């Protein structure tokens, strides 16, 4: 075999390897694209169902549906808890009695149920604390308070579920997260909006990210 023939064979082998590699890359890319599209579709459909279910209630509850973060945010601190307290106000309990069963019914619909990774209850506070606490101490005081509050919300809504299968599924997805003042809400002039920063959010996380990570790991 001449050198030119050998080079031709090597080039063919290299070309074949390149084609196989590119095909593999394209397959993985298509899988990830498909998951991303499915995630986007699922997020839009969940948002639309939440809007349809709660549009008439959100303003009454002083709540906001955020389609970007897939969350419902309760923003009126006066109806949530007493100042400095983790105990739920009766009015907030009545809101949760109306909100959560309908909320969880949407998420346990067969078209969404297997896509739900986590339902986060997030407690947020302003940066201030009563007295002359330093900003550092105020942060940790508010961290403890926000954690206590989300735990109380978690305890209350779970106590209202009587169906054992639904309770088991909800417990496997629901988490309580106290975040103190780490995610403040700001006014247009970039000053802290202390009232709106004090809030409770129910945030939905789908498993699209985990599916993409699994594909990437399998492709290594």
Locate the predicted segments by residue:
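Short terminal targeting/anchoring segments
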Residues: 1-55, 67
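Short, solvent-exposed beta-strand/turn patches at coil↔beta or beta↔helix junctions
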Residues: 68-97, 128-141
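Short edge beta-strands and adjacent turn/loop segments
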Residues: 60-73, 117-119, 126
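Periplasmic peptidoglycan-binding/anchoring modules of Gram-negative envelope and division proteins
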Residues: 85-120, 154-159, 202, 210-220
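Extracytoplasmic/periplasmic, Sec-exported soluble proteins
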Residues: 35-42, 84-95, 141-149, 194
